Structures are given as C-alpha cells and as structure tokens.
Regions:
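Long extracytoplasmic/lumenal interhelical loops at the membrane interface
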Residues: 290-349
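Interfacial transmembrane-helix termini
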Residues: 19-38, 63-85, 95-104, 112-135, ...
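Hydrophobic transmembrane alpha-helices and their immediate junctions
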Residues: 214, 261-262, 348-386
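Transmembrane alpha-helical segments and their membrane-water interfaces
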Residues: 42-48, 84-165, 206, 252-253, ...
Length: 418
C-alpha cells in the first residue's frame, strides 16, 4: 500500500473516531470503563503500528476534546496513562523513527528540574510533571523535515471547530452559569477560550500567508477563523480575547502580504466586529470589560496573599521553590490556584524555575533569529501564551493542550531553522 493511500485511510479512520468521541454528550456520566479501554486502544494502535508520526497529533486532538468538550469523555483524565502510552509506543517504534526530532536541551533541564522539585519538596508527581514528560517524549515522534507539519496545524484547527460547534449547539442547554453577567460554560471559560484561540490564530496564519496545502484546507481555516472569533466574543473571556487579538495583529502586521491586502484584511475584520456587535454578540464581553472590579475578579487578592507567603519563606525556598502541591495550599486555607503562571513558577519552583521557564519560552526566538519568514508566526504564538499566562496558570497547572501548543511553536521554529 502506498504511503499516500495509507494516510488517506488513517484520516478517514480518525474522522470516524472523532464522530464516536463527539457522539457521547452526557455531562454527568462517562461511558462504561470496558468501552473506554477499547476506544483508547482503537485510538492509539493504528498510529503506533502504521504511522507513528501521527500518534502525537492524535493524542493532542483527542485529549483536548476530552478535556474541554461538553461531556464526560471516552478519554481518560489521568495523565499518567498518556505518559505510559507515549513511553511504550516510543519503545516499540523507536527503530522505525528515522531522522526524528530531539527535545531541546533547555527543555530537558527544565523538565528534570520541575519533576525533581515536585518529587522532593512536594513528595509527589503532579499534572505538570506528567505533561512535561509526555511532551518531552513526544518530540521523538516528529520528523526533522516537518513533512507532517500540516497535521499539527490541523489538530488545533479541528479542536477549535468542534469546540465551537459544541458551544453553539449545546452551550445553553448543558452549561453551568459561572457569573452574574450571564456568561455560561461547562468548563472554565478562560482555559476553554484560550484553547479555541490557538486554532483561530493558526488558521488565520494559514489564510493570510496562503499556507494551505489545498483549497479544502483553506476553506476549513476560513471556517475556523469565523467560528472561533464568534465563540471568543460570546464566551466573554477577556484574557482569551486579548491573547487572540494580539497574536492576530502580529500576524497581520508582519505577514508577507502587500500593504493593500493588509488594509483589506483589517477592513474585513472591522466589518465582522461591527456585524457581531450589531447582533449583540459583544454584550456579555462588553459588560465584563466595563466591570469596575479593580481586583480582576479577586486575582490581585490571590497574588498578594501568595506573594506574601513566598516572601515569608527562607532563602532556599525562594531560590528553588516548594513544589506545586505546597504552593497550591500556600497562604490560602483549603488551597487555591495562582491565576498567574509567572507567580506560580516563582513560588512553586523558585527563582531558578522562573528563569528556566523564560529560557524555554525564549528558545524558539533563538531559532528564528535568522529566519524572517517564520518570525511573525512564532512571535505571535509566543505572545499568545505569554498573555494568557498573565491571568491563568495553564503551564504550572499541567494543562497538556497548552504544553503541546508550546511544542508546536518549537517545531514551527525548528522546521524553518533546519
């Protein structure tokens, strides 16, 4: 069987698996455990046996939909299961992986450091440790020349499209009200919004810079941008909307297209915004933007308490941190998240951990220093994760989709660099 025919069959197969995943829409009960195990095996075995380079995009797509989708999913919630899958798969197929990627040395150091601090200081491995280890091993499944690059972009586009459809079809009937403004969601709308924003930015880059391999891909990208932008407005997450907006501005301003086309794109976006505003899509977002709460829904109070707890620690703790588990319970009875990745890294992993985090963020910039064609997309995606980390803690919280998004940024920078 030719490689082209094999991949076509695998695409059809995984499209069917997506339909099965999305067909379970109960928000209160998961499928029976035997059925979930069979589904998981059916999901990973074809990729492992026939196309190992597809395993990572498949896991990234299905774990995101399982986490942020409307229902209790076929996909397990325990991250150690995915670490086991990736580790066993790598052991089985390593000899078949020719000219594969390697994780950045600085990322390896960061991963070892974080896991060590959590194990020694927190006395347990937590979600961030499992997510880091999963991504570290995932690099080995990726080719150096990037022939599967479109699969990774398509992964985040599919995530955005399906989550958008969930939002518009089931959003009102199955949502849980989370604010007095009427904003509704079945998961945290801030994390949900940023995950959808990832696909919007990638799709927008495909459309503006004409990177689609065929016209069908381009049409899907256009649909993604349209659906995703409308979702982000109606989802009313200020942070997610800001992250997406900044990234899109960077892509537009620094894209390769002519000035006349950039002006046309800006006018088209402006018309879209006016249309959505006229239809009332901006109502909840506008109300939240005009909110006079100077604490950012209590975020500054949390930051102050956590920072005070950090300053009360000894020098060793300030340098190397206290681990995620102890940081979660620091200063606030019952425990509470930081709502800021930078503060979370500082408290949980010390000054050393925060510096290492900035180093892994800066790594893709180093790769594109001499690659002007890839600078806009890499800078825009880095700006996206840096902004969303200001009011959330997706990375210290161990959100696997966000770590896979970081991995994609590295790959986009590397594929151009090599």
């Amino acid at each position: 069987m030719s490689e082209r025919r094999l991949y076509r069959r695998l695409y059809i197969y995984y499209f069917f698996m997506l339909i099965v995943l999305c067909s379970w829409v109960s928000p209160t009960s998961a499928p029976p455990m035997p059925l979930r195990l069979v589904y998981l095996l059916a999901l990973v075995l074809p990729a492992i046996l026939k196309a190992p380079n597809m395993l990572v995009p498949v896991l990234a797509c299905f774990t995101a939909l399982g986490t942020y989708g409307i229902s209790c999913s076929y996909m397990p919630t325990e991250k150690w299961i995915y670490l086991l899958i990736v580790a066993v798969s790598l052991f089985l197929v390593f000899s078949r992986l020719k000219s594969c990627q390697r994780p950045p040395i600085i990322f390896v150091v960061f991963c070892i450091y974080v896991c060590f601090i959590d194990f020694i200081r927190g006395e347990e491995l937590v979600d961030i440790d499992y997510s880091l280890l999963i991504v570290l091993l995932s690099f080995f499944f990726v080719s150096k020349n990037g022939y599967e690059k479109d699969n990774y972009t398509l992964t985040f586009i599919i995530i955005t499209v399906i989550l958008s459809l969930f939002f518009f079809i089931y959003g009102q009937s199955s949502a849980v009200e989370v604010s007095e403004t009427g904003r509704r969601s079945w998961v945290d709308p801030n994390y949900f919004g940023n995950v959808c924003g990832m696909g919007v930015v990638l799709a927008y880059n495909v459309v503006v810079n004409k990177l689609a391999p065929n016209r069908y891909f381009n049409k899907i990208a256009i649909i993604t941008v349209t659906l995703g932008m409308l979702l982000l407005v109606m989802n009313a997450s200020r942070g997610a909307f800001l992250s997406m907006s900044v990234a899109i501005v960077v892509v537009t301003v620094f894209s390769k297209v002519k000035l006349k086309k950039k002006i046309g794109i800006a006018l088209l976006v402006a018309l879209g915004v006016i249309a959505m505003y006229s239809l009332g899509a901006f109502d909840v977002l506008t109300e939240r933007l005009m909110d006079e709460d100077i604490t950012g829904n209590g975020r500054t109070i949390i930051w102050g308490a956590k920072m005070q707890g950090y300053m009360n620690g000894d020098t060793f703790e300030k340098l190397f941190g206290i681990g995620y588990s102890k940081g979660f319970y620091l200063a606030i009875p019952g425990g509470f998240g930081f709502h800021n990745d930078y503060l979370a890294f500082l408290v949980d992993y010390g000054v050393v951990g925060l510096i290492l985090f900035f180093c892994i963020v800066a790594y893709p910039l180093k790769l594109v220093a001499n690659s002007p064609s890839k600078r806009p997309i890499v800078i825009s995606l880095l700006a996206f994760i840096l902004i969303c980390s200001m009011t959330l803690e997706p990375f210290t919280y161990g959100r696997l989709t966000y770590w896979y998004f970081y991995m994609l940024i590295v790959l986009l920078a590397r594929w151009d660099h090599t």
